[in-house]
Amino acid sequence: MKPICIIPARSGSKGLPDKNMLFLAGKPMIFHTIDAAIESGMFDKKDIFVSTDSELYREICLERGISVVMRKPELSTDQATSYDMLKDFLSDYEDNQEFVLLQVTSPLRKSWHIKEAMEYYSSHDVDNVVSFSEVEKHPGLFTTLSDKGYAIDMVGADKGYRRQDLQPLYYPNGAIFISNKETYLREKSFFTSRTYAYQMAKEFSLDVDTRDDFIHVIGHLFFDYAIREKENKVFYKEGYSRLFNREASKIILGDSKTISISLENYHNYSQGGVTLATMLENLPNFLTANVTEAFVSIGVNDLITGYSVEEIFSNFQKLYSLLAENKIKMRFTTIAYTLFRETVNNADIEKINQWLTEFCYQNQIPLLDINRFLSKDGNLNYHLTSDGLHFTQEANDLLQSQYQLFVDEVKTL
């Protein structure tokens, strides 16, 4: 018997109206849950059910090719519980029917979370599987307040307090609930002594209940650079098309740091935010037979996006092979250090730069170490950056002059 998936989507939210359908990262929030269920590969599409009281929700959700069940009026009020809804929904199924409840308000839950949780349920003797996350703030630091505003439960709480000595605590994050009809209706709960806690990391466990929660999730998705790279592929492809110059014989391949660089007889193909990986995908489209030289200064965005150091090594090798096959002369720069950036660390940049230095030496490629004049004590110089990653005008001017000197020096070799 195949499992079924149930996605509740009542329309009457008072705290955040229509929260289940609010557009999030280009699609209604409910689609993040529907798509995760589909992509998990654990259900037939017809066995993914949205339970709603809204004809508009129904019409939109059907666009995903799944099933929609309209709730009875008495199950559409804010007094109706999840148990009431599930008891009614499961009434026509066999007692051993396995089901998964996915709440729309956990839009960051991934397809592989669903798959892993279901595989555990199927292979172990448990009543239920429910997703849990670790509590950030220990309840030992919580208190009630007296009428006068005193923290009466906290007296002496900081004496010898060491967070690392506290036992980790976990809470159900609302993302995944798995059971079967007989067990759930008997217990009237997903929580028994035999409920297995499927642990999910904090970054996937945000629950949307208020406007502040929704804004938090928007911010999380905005700073998911892997998603942004995927969504921006068309943007970069169009960008390279706009920059295309069939007659160019010398080209600059870079990101935002090289956009302002102007070298005589060089055509600049730099784009802000682009990764080496994305540039590689597009390179065959603008690498004409006229190109004889390439100046490459790229790589930090790959680290920010989440590519491993080894993947970046591999992509540099692919770039070298492609340019070498076309008998194109190359010159590279190291990757500039950053300063106080959460998304990238200089230890990884140093690993890549050391690898680039050895690689360029072995293949007789001229290499310019831009950190010689941009860094201080192993970091990007504070006076040369606007945000720890991007350059000030002073840095851009310095880069321009050093690039020009480098090109001129290589000419004389």
UniProtKB/Swiss-Prot annotation:
* Compartments in which it is found: Cytoplasm
- Record-level GO cellular component terms: cytoplasm
- InterPro entries in the cross-refs: CMP-NeuNAc_synthase, Cytidylyl_trans, Nucleotide-diphossugar_trans, SGNH_hydro, SGNH_hydro_sf
* Source taxonomy: Bacteria, Bacillati, Bacillota, Bacilli, Lactobacillales
**GO biological process annotations for this chain's record?**
polysaccharide biosynthetic process
Catalytic activity, EC: 2.7.7.43
Name any cofactors this protein relies on.
Answer: Mg(2+); Mn(2+)
- Protein family according to the UniProt entry: Belongs to the CMP-NeuNAc synthase family.
Judged by the first EC level, this protein's enzyme class is transferase
Pfam families to which the protein is assigned, alphabetical: CTP_transf_3, Lipase_GDSL_2
Q: Name one GO molecular function term.
A: N-acylneuraminate cytidylyltransferase activity
The gene it comes from is neuA
Q: What organism does the UniProt record list as the source?
A: Streptococcus agalactiae serotype III (strain NEM316)
Q: What is this protein called?
A: N-acylneuraminate cytidylyltransferase
